[in-house]
Design a protein with these regions (language model features):
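Blade/loop signatures of beta-propeller domains
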Residues: 1-3
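Surface-exposed loop and turn segments in beta-propeller and other repeat-based domains
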Residues: 5-10, 57-75
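Beta-strand-rich domains and repeat architectures in extracellular enzymes and scaffolds
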Residues: 8-43
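Structural signature of eukaryotic scaffold interfaces centered on beta-propeller domains
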Residues: 17-25, 72-88, 100
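Aromatic (tryptophan-biased) beta-strands that constitute blades/sheets of beta-rich domains
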Residues: 30, 55-57, 92
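Short, conserved, GDST-rich strand-edge loop motifs in beta-rich repeat architectures
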Residues: 32-43, 93-120
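A short loop-to-beta-strand structural motif that recurs across blades of beta-propeller domains
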Residues: 43-46, 124-126
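Short loop/turn segments that connect beta-strands within beta-propeller blades
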Residues: 49-52, 128-130
Length: 130
């Protein structure tokens, strides 16, 4: 029988979902730690090393893409299923919007579509060099 190991993301206490998980050629596991229920949270790219059992918080994706989760706009809150390790050592990722702006309690996309401040900017594709 296999061993069950829980990894807790202590540095992200308000983030509550993970929609993306992959193992890269370097043997490390990469996770998109998402914030969908609390307004104004950005997705984080986190690395877990199963050999050393250490966690490293690599990237606030929204900040890295110039879209601060605290700006009042719909935040980049999720890496949604799209996290592909390439043979070139890069992760190829796709973002998604599913968390409310910092000013909202609940995500209601139809209330932000025509708001020039709160609207989502569209999906983003990005790479991360592992």
């Amino acid at each position: 029988m296999g061993k069950l190991k829980s990894v807790v993301f202590d540095a992200l206490p308000e983030h509550e979902t993970c929609w993306s998980l992959t193992t890269a050629p370097n043997g490390k596991i990469y996770i998109g730690v998402c914030g969908e229920l609390t307004g104004g949270l950005s997705v984080f790219l986190v690395q877990y090393d199963p050999e050393t059992e250490t966690t490293e918080y690599l990237l606030d994706v929204g900040e890295a893409l110039g879209r601060s989760a605290r700006s009042g706009a719909t935040p980049i809150s999720k890496v949604h299923y799209g996290m592909i390790p390439g043979h070139d050592g890069k992760l190829y990722c796709a973002t998604h919007f599913s968390g409310p702006p910092v000013t909202d309690v609940v995500w209601r996309p139809w209330q932000t579509w025509d708001d020039p401040v709160r609207m989502a900017c569209g999906l983003c594709l990005f790479t991360y060099d592992t």
